[in-house]
């Protein structure tokens, strides 16, 4: 870990000690923004939580642009609450992990999104700079307005996401070019379309996925897995990991939220490969919930784009660091000193 990463971790340790010794383990959540004058941009240091950035993004964008990044399904996450545990020494709090051989400060990755130039003039480059400043691993979309070489210079260790292409050979070449440019992991988003007939997604069989896995020569991850059988087959086929996500099926009407299907997938995979998950993450505690359900880490996208739209790279950094700090606080609440200590019995799932 770098010196900056070490100092930030020390700050989290201090926070953990303070919370653990406090008679009030966790302060009440700050209220949402109220009484703001129309168009006024709140100073970034005044934010109490990540959801407040959504309103600032709305004020910064056209209605059409804002609709792209608004909302997101959260009902499954909101049905989960924590079970607090006292008398646990959490002064040595540690959020770090190693994923596909890559050390990470926390289990919070910045998820991929295309056309970020519609949100901020610096687009994906600003996101990369903010993610890099927050020591978060960035997953970049192939349909990016910023050359990958610039992105990875700002966010070392970045991953590259690709989409199925009817020309498998051309896709293999693009994957290899990304790896040569420094991509640490390749992610293929299932169900997306490139090079196929209009409105008809390109679907790959396992033979093609294995071919692309071999072309990557770095960890190869599938994004868009929602079925336990698919995740288990991926593990058997030598896929490095999967992202539980409904993006791969086009978010069809009635589609389950990723967190809702995560436990069944985790049970089927039984630790054979890492499981990542996206969808609806707004608070650091949401990430803790996902880990308790079997995830290794979470991809966060929309809130990062709110920060980008309102404050550029600084907003991205602030959003990610707030999520990291909230995760630390909530780990203290449940008595988990590190990610391996997070268990299913730290949470309760309510029926409604």
Regions found by a protein language model. Give the residues of each.
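N-terminal secretory signal peptides and thylakoid transit peptides that target proteins
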Residues: 1-19
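An N-cap/entry alpha-helix motif that binds or orients negatively charged groups
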Residues: 31-104, 198-204, 340-342, 348-352
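Conserved, mostly hydrophobic/aromatic
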Residues: 62, 110, 131, 188, ...
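A gly/proline- and charged-residue-enriched helix-loop-helix capping module
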Residues: 133-152, 159-168
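Acidic (Asp/Glu)-rich catalytic clusters
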Residues: 148-155, 179-180, 235
């Amino acid at each position: 870990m770098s010196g900056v990463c070490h100092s930030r971790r020390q700050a989290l340790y201090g926070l953990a000690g303070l919370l653990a010794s406090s008679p009030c383990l966790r302060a009440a959540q700050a209220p949402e923004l109220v009484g703001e004058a129309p168009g006024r941009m709140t100073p970034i240091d005044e934010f109490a939580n990540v959801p407040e950035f959504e309103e600032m993004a709305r004020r910064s964008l056209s209605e059409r642009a804002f609709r792209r990044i608004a909302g997101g399904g959260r009902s499954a996450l909101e049905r989960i609450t924590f079970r607090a545990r006292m008398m646990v020494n959490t002064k040595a709090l540690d959020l770090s992990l190693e994923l596909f051989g890559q050390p990470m400060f926390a289990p919070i990755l910045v998820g991929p999104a295309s056309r970020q130039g519609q949100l901020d003039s610096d687009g994906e480059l600003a996101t990369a700079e903010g993610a890099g400043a927050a020591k978060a691993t960035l997953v970049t979309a192939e349909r990016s307005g910023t050359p990958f070489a610039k992105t990875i210079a700002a966010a070392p260790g970045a991953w590259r996401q690709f989409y199925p292409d009817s020309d498998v050979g051309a896709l293999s070449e693009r994957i290899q070019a990304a790896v040569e440019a420094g991509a640490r992991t390749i992610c293929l988003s299932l169900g997306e379309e490139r090079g196929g007939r209009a409105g008809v997604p390109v679907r790959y069989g396992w033979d093609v996925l294995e071919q692309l896995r071999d072309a990557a020569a770095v960890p190869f991850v599938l994004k868009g897995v929602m079925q336990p059988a698919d995740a288990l087959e991926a593990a058997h086929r030598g896929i490095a990991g999967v992202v539980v996500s409904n993006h791969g099926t086009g978010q069809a009407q009635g589609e389950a939220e990723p967190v809702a299907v995560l436990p069944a997938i985790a049970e089927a995979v039984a630790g054979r490969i890492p499981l990542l998950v996206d969808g609806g993450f707004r608070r650091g505690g949401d990430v803790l919930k996902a880990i308790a359900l079997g995830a290794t880490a979470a991809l966060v996208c929309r809130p990062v784009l709110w920060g980008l739209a309102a404050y550029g790279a600084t907003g991205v950094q602030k959003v990610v660091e707030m999520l990291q700090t909230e995760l630390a606080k909530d780990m203290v609440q449940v008595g988990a000193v590190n990610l391996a200590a997070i268990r299913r019995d730290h949470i309760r799932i309510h029926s409604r």
